[in-house]
Amino acid sequence: MVTLAELLALLAALLATASGYFVSIDAHAEECFFERVTSGTKMGLIFEVAEGGFLDIDVEITGPDNKGIYKGDRESSGKYTFAAHMDGTYKFCFSNRMSTMTPKIVMFTIDIGEAPKGQDMETEAHQNKLEEMINELAVAMTAVKHEQEYMEVRERIHRAINDNTNSRVVLWSFFEALVLVAMTLGQIYYLKRFFEVRRVV
């Protein structure tokens, strides 16, 4: 029989397999992150550019044999999942080399699934239903946590866009008001000079 403490420890271990990070990538720079897994392990990368330039970044996932698994150019967000094709260290890289001067802030999460079970466990006919339910609950909780983090980032991005647009509209309105006042004063001056009576002495 599985105790409550063992169940909580299993749930905590399952939730700990997903790591969320914010990283700042300077112009002309590349940042890489590494995960060592066994063959057959399910892995996933979820990312979103939170700040900087046109909110785009180059993404590349490479296997231990230097085989390209995924490559995306100028992406602002994305989700990609795959199963490890061999044992070893997998490389997740974000490149800002296309940017001339703007650093980018990228929020990303690397999800590492459970390692594949051994033959002796696969041959068992009966699996513990409680462990299965806890595993499903942990996956669902991780997905909700990721979705909440991405919603916060999107809300921050849209608020920054709204503030920027609002300040531009206010500045443009102020400029238009100044032009209107200048034109009004110019017309008054012109009409006043037009109706002036010039005396010849």
Curated annotation (Swiss-Prot):
Subcellular location: Cytoplasmic vesicle membrane; Cytoplasmic vesicle, COPI-coated vesicle membrane; Golgi apparatus, cis-Golgi network membrane; Golgi apparatus, Golgi stack membrane
Note: Animals do not show Tmed2 protein expression and also have reduced protein levels of Tmed7 and Tmed10. Prior to death at mid-gestation, embryos exhibit developmental delay, abnormal rostral-caudal elongation, randomized heart looping, and absence of the labyrinth layer of the placenta.
Family classification: Belongs to the EMP24/GP25L family.
Biological classification of the source: Eukaryota, Metazoa, Chordata, Craniata, Vertebrata
Outcome of swapping residue 15 to E: Embryonic lethal
Interaction with F2RL1 as annotated region, ranges: 1-181
PROSITE patterns: GOLD (PS50866)
Gene behind this protein: Tmed2
UniProt topology in membrane: Single-pass type I membrane protein
Ranges in the topological domain labelled Lumenal: 21-168
GOLD domain residues: 30-112
Pfam families: EMP24_GP25L (PF01105)
Ranges spanned by the short sequence motif COPI vesicle coat-binding, renumbered to the chain: 194-201
Organism of origin: Mus musculus
Spans traversing the lipid bilayer: 169-189
Segments forming a coiled coil: 117-167
Function field: Involved in vesicular protein trafficking. Mainly functions in the early secretory pathway but also in post-Golgi membranes. Thought to act as cargo receptor at the lumenal side for incorporation of secretory cargo molecules into transport vesicles and to be involved in vesicle coat formation at the cytoplasmic side.
Stretches in topological domain Cytoplasmic: 190-201
The name this protein goes by in its record: Transmembrane emp24 domain-containing protein 2
SUPFAM superfamilies to which the protein is assigned, alphabetical: Supernatant protein factor (SPF), C-terminal domain
InterPro entries: Emp24-like (IPR015720), GOLD_dom (IPR009038), GOLD_dom_sf (IPR036598)
Quaternary context: Monomer and homodimer in the endoplasmic reticulum, endoplasmic reticulum-Golgi intermediate compartment and Golgi. Probably oligomerizes with other members of the EMP24/GP25L family such as TMED7, TMED9 and TMED10. Interacts (via GOLD domain) with TMED10 (via GOLD domain). Associates with the COPI vesicle coat (coatomer); TMED10:TMED2 heterotetramers are proposed to be involved in coatomer association. Interacts (via C-terminus) with COPG1; the interaction involves dimeric TMED2. Interacts with SEC23A; indicative for an association of TMED2 with the COPII vesicle coat.
An example Gene Ontology biological process: somitogenesis
Signal peptide annotation: 1-20
Keyword annotations: Coiled coil, Cytoplasmic vesicle, Endoplasmic reticulum, ER-Golgi transport, Golgi apparatus, Membrane, Protein transport, Signal, Transmembrane, Transmembrane helix, Transport
Annotated stretches, region: Required for TMED10 and TMED2 cis-Golgi network localization: 118-157
Highest taxon listed in the record's lineage: Eukaryota
